[in-house]
């Protein structure tokens, strides 16, 4: 399979920028319409950024800034 099959998304997060759980607009860019976290191969994030993003999304869900599941999806 060709490597150009998947279109790599450019990350809106620069290396070194913090990922904050209160920045809901940023977190929504990395979540599907069903509420799932996008995989690293689609987001273009580094491994550390993906871990930080996952923790931020989970924390935002716990404090009710993001829904666990999108009922409209």
From Swiss-Prot:
Listed SUPFAM superfamilies: Ribosomal protein S18
GO molecular function: small ribosomal subunit rRNA binding; structural constituent of ribosome
Keywords: Organellar chromatophore, Plastid, Ribonucleoprotein, Ribosomal protein, RNA-binding, rRNA-binding
Annotated compartments: Plastid, Organellar chromatophore
Database matches in PROSITE patterns: RIBOSOMAL_S18
GO cellular component terms listed in the entry, alphabetical order: cytosolic small ribosomal subunit; organellar chromatophore; plastid
Gene Ontology BP term (one): translation
The keyword RNA-binding is assigned to this record: yes
Family designation: Belongs to the bacterial ribosomal protein bS18 family.
Oligomer and partners: Part of the 30S ribosomal subunit.
NCBIfam families: S18 (TIGR00165)
Protein known as: Small ribosomal subunit protein bS18c
């Amino acid at each position: 399979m060709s490597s150009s099959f998947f279109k790599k998304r450019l990350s809106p997060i620069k290396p070194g920028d913090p990922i904050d759980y209160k920045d809901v607009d940023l977190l929504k860019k990395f979540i599907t319409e069903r509420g799932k976290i996008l995989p690293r191969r689609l987001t273009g994030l580094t491994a550390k950024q993906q871990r930080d993003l996952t923790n931020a999304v989970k924390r935002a869900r716990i404090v009710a800034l993001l829904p666990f599941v999108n009922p409209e999806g």
